[in-house]
Regions:
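Gly/Trp-centered helix-boundary motif
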Residues: 1-179, 183, 187, 296, ...
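Alpha-helical transmembrane segments of integral membrane proteins
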Residues: 152-367
Length: 367
């Protein structure tokens, strides 16, 4: 039987679930909570693929229903609630960051119901400022457009809400795919060593030698502008860094005594990597995902700002910045609001990433 150990002692104050709090009833609810999280994650991802219209509608409703159920269960279940409260007391900035991310995801899920207007609709405001004929460049506080309208009369608030859908989807999909691929390659490279490890590291060095935005621009020029191509380009950028970090951690773990003992008795290498090394790099995997999420959102916004990201007509925070750039002197709100949205999400994921790193890495506890 495989034995899973960690080489560090977990901090009792930050223990996720204490055994005393788990009763037969709560264990069933915990299983239901876990299933709800999984259902929401899957439906959230699939809902952005643009499948058959009726199926897309069903999947979106599943995501909309599972999100509040998940949040209610998190508040009701004592083990989950106590863990969140401990995290809030110990890492308040990280907890605030988590709230901002949840709000951003909720904005994405309920965008069609929260946004006051169609993001591409024109002439939605009634303003005396700006151009009252075409109703463009209406300032913030305008009736029908609380954050104003843009250069062709579209509601800035509605475009900001729908822009969260693209930014969060691209960011989350990128880190999920990129960090997962990097983890698999990093563990395999560290454990195998030899020629395979050398080849992987040379490829990693070559890809990391390019500035990220330059590499992304080159890939988008080759692939063409689309949401999925943006995800592919960002995955290519993230995989080398994730591979290097996970490989470094896996090299340390594979020299632990119990893993050396497993190897000495002829345990299957794949089994060792999956049952012994992988569980010990999960903490690093989670921290990498949160830290790189902000980076992915910024790069996606940069590509949209440069006009090579998502197709024209799809509202994104980056494309809103590009539109506002030409009118920044007189209509500054066109860049202020999307800029605030990007900054808020990036700061939130960085705060959350730092907090999770401090919690999950025993070497950093107490700082």
């Amino acid at each position: 039987m495989a034995v899973f150990r960690t080489d560090e002692v977990q901090d009792a104050d930050l223990e996720a679930v204490s055994l005393e709090q788990i009763t037969p009833a709560s264990s069933g609810l915990l299983a239901f909570f876990t299933a709800t999280v999984a259902v929401f994650a899957v439906s959230y991802i699939i809902s952005h693929f643009g499948t058959v219209s009726w199926l897309d509608t069903v999947i979106r409703y599943i995501a909309m229903i599972s999100l509040p159920v998940m949040l209610v269960l998190a508040a009701v279940l004592k083990p989950v609630r106590s863990t969140i409260l401990r995290f809030w007391r110990r890492k308040p900035l990280a907890a605030i960051g988590m709230i901002v991310i949840v709000l951003a995801v909720a904005t994405d899920v309920y965008a069609d119901y929260v946004a006051p207007h169609d993001p591409e609709g024109v002439g939605v405001a009634k303003c005396e400022s700006g151009d009252s004929t075409t109703r463009k460049f209406c300032g913030p506080g305008t009736e029908g457009a609380p954050l104003g309208t843009d250069n062709i009369g579209r509601d800035v608030l509605s475009r900001l809400i729908h822009g969260a859908r693209i930014s969060m989807y691209v960011g989350l999909m990128t880190v999920l795919i990129g960090i997962t691929i990097g983890t698999v390659i990093g563990i395999g490279s560290a454990y195998s060593g030899g020629v395979f490890d050398i080849i992987v590291q040379r490829l990693v060095d070559a890809l990391m030698g390019f500035p990220p935005i330059i590499l992304a621009l080159g890939l988008m020029a080759a692939l063409g502008a689309s949401i999925n191509n943006v995800v592919i380009a960002l995955v290519v950028i993230l995989v080398p860094g994730a591979t290097r970090v996970i490989r470094s951690e896996a090299l340390r773990i594979k020299e632990l005594d119990y893993i050396l003992a497993s190897r000495s008795i002829g345990a299957n290498p794949v089994r060792i990597m999956i049952q012994h090394i992988l569980p010990n790099v999960i903490a690093t995997y989670i921290v990498l995902m949160t830290i790189t999420l902000g980076f992915a959102i910024v790069v996606e916004a940069s590509l949209s700002f440069l006009g090579v990201g998502v197709p024209e007509g799809v509202p994104t925070w980056g494309s809103m910045l590009e539109i506002g750039r030409a009118h920044i002197d007189e209509q500054g709100w066109l860049v202020v609001f999307p800029g605030i949205a990007i900054a808020a999400v990036v700061f939130a994921v960085n705060f959350l990433g730092d907090g999770l790193r401090d919690v999950l890495d025993p070497r950093l506890r107490g700082r």
